[in-house]
């Protein structure tokens, strides 16, 4: 028998075994048919959020009642959680069993061997979270609101120029630059763009590097999940480079500048704080850990809030009656016509607060949460279900936030549902749940509150064509965002 025939027979046997294993193991969980090699990825390839939502209804007849559904991301067993009580049992009662991330070649390279914060494994996650929390509560944070206010004033000034010149306004590019400036000032004490002066060569490289990495992260690469391709793909990335490399080079330059000029008794920003905290424990792996940490802070701090701001603007344009109500509420809180909305006004703007919550419910920026991997098996549901070691756990937030069992008219924009502070609090967690929720939640909420409230206060946000609606069909990338759109601005006479 020739080697070729043996090889063909071996491949056929492997494909048969792979098909049987994926579909007949872990049978306590139901899920779609898994194909050899690719698993469930073809099932999920189009409008993934809607496929997940439909699956939650399709598999409601089993013991799990659609609460947990099994998928295979190539060779990676994945359980999607569709029920808030099940999610709380997993994340709140078993946090020690979810102490790591899925270790793919891409997360290995981005996290520099899993040393980041989003990509951190069980060896780094707790320490890195602790020192980041110290950085977020340090001296620099006290001036964060003033930084957001300054950037907001600059953006509004630019928007007034756009409105006066009769141009349309592009939320995507402007919000990306706006939120990038805030996070760069917070982390590095520098801006990356001045709206009026344009972008210099170095700033252009920063923006390009960020966008290239976003584009890469938008794709689910099969080679990240197939057992036999992982080592070869990792070797390829190390030999020929990764889209994260360009941004890492720039961040390394910023790190070295800070390292040389740092005052260990007076942190200027988050990067200084991280360096100081690492040197308190001897500085081991300082540079190799801090670079991926700030890299992930930049990505998360820019993309998710930029996407949320786009959804908020889209929703205001598509719901002009609510936009006017919110404007009247915001205007009534101000003592003078030249004042701006600040964090101190938050308790006086319940409708705006509810509208922002409702936008995050309808369009969660990370619709499946941040995946985690089970590092030790555990049982839930009174011991009737065992979550095996090595399983990837994802939260189907989009499905939960539109489940009619939890929400009245779940597909409609109804901010009134959040006017009662305790309403839906048990079923609403756009920033995650448990000790592993979003570390920058407060930062994000402050940014969104100051920036978006003042945009509505200063402008009537209108569609390009009168009485039309902007398409709210989302696209998937690093985050959940709308198709790119433009709007018209009409200056308010405050």
UniProtKB/Swiss-Prot annotation:
It is a single-pass membrane protein. It is an enzyme of class 1 (oxidoreductase). The keyword Transport does not apply. Heme binds at residue 438. Gene3D superfamilies: Cytochrome P450. It comes from the Eukaryota. Its cofactor is heme. This is Probable cytochrome P450 518A1. It comes from Dictyostelium discoideum (Social amoeba). The gene is cyp518A1.
């Amino acid at each position: 028998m020739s080697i070729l025939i043996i090889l063909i027979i071996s491949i056929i046997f492997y494909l048969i075994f792979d098909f049987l294993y994926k579909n007949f193991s872990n049978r306590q969980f139901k899920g779609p048919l898994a194909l050899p090699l690719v698993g469930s990825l073809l099932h999920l390839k189009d409008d993934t959020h809607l496929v997940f939502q439909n699956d939650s209804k399709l598999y409601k007849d089993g013991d799990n009642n659609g609460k947990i559904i099994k998928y295979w991301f190539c060779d990676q067993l994945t359980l999607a959680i569709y029920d808030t009580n099940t999610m709380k049992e997993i994340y709140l009662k078993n946090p020690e069993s979810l102490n790591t991330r899925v270790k793919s070649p891409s997360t290995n390279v981005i996290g520099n061997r899993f040393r980041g914060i989003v990509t951190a494994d069980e060896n780094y996650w707790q320490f890195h979270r602790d020192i980041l929390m110290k950085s977020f509560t340090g001296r620099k944070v006290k001036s964060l609101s003033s930084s957001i206010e300054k950037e907001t004033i600059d953006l509004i000034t630019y928007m007034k120029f756009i409105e006066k010149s009769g141009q349309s306004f592009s939320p995507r590019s402007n919000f990306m630059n706006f939120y990038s400036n805030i996070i760069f000032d917070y982390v590095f004490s520098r801006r990356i763009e001045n709206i009026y002066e344009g972008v210099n060569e170095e700033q252009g490289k920063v923006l390009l590097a960020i966008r290239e990495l976003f584009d890469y992260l938008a794709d689910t690469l099969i080679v990240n999940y197939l057992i036999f391709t992982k080592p070869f793909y990792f070797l390829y990335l190390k030999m020929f480079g990764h889209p994260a490399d360009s941004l890492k080079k720039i961040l390394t330059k910023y790190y070295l500048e800070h390292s040389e000029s740092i005052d260990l008794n007076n942190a200027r920003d988050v990067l200084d704080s991280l360096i100081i905290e690492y040197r308190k424990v001897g500085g081991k792996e300082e540079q190799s850990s801090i670079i991926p940490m700030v890299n992930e802070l930049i990505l998360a701090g820019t993309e998710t809030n930029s996407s949320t701001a786009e959804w908020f603007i889209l929703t205001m344009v598509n719901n002009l009656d609510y936009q006017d109500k919110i404007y009247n509420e915001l205007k009534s809180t101000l003592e003078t016509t030249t004042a701006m909305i600040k964090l101190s006004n938050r308790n006086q703007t319940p409708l705006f607060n509810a509208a922002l919550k409702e936008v995050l419910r309808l369009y969660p920026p990370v619709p499946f949460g941040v995946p985690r991997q089970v590092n030790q098996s555990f049982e839930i549901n009174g011991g009737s279900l065992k979550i095996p070691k090595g399983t990837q756990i994802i939260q189907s937030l989009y499905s939960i936030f539109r489940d009619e069992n939890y929400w009245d008219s779940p597909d409609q924009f109804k901010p009134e549902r959040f006017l009662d502070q305790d309403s839906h609090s048990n079923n609403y967690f756009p920033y995650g749940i448990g000790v592993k929720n979003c570390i920058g939640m407060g930062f994000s909420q402050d940014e969104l509150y100051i920036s978006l409230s003042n945009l509505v206060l200063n402008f009537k946000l209108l569609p390009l064509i009168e009485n039309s609606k902007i398409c709210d069909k989302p696209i998937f990338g690093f985050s959940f965002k709308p198709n790119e759109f433009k709007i018209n601005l009409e200056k308010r006479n405050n």
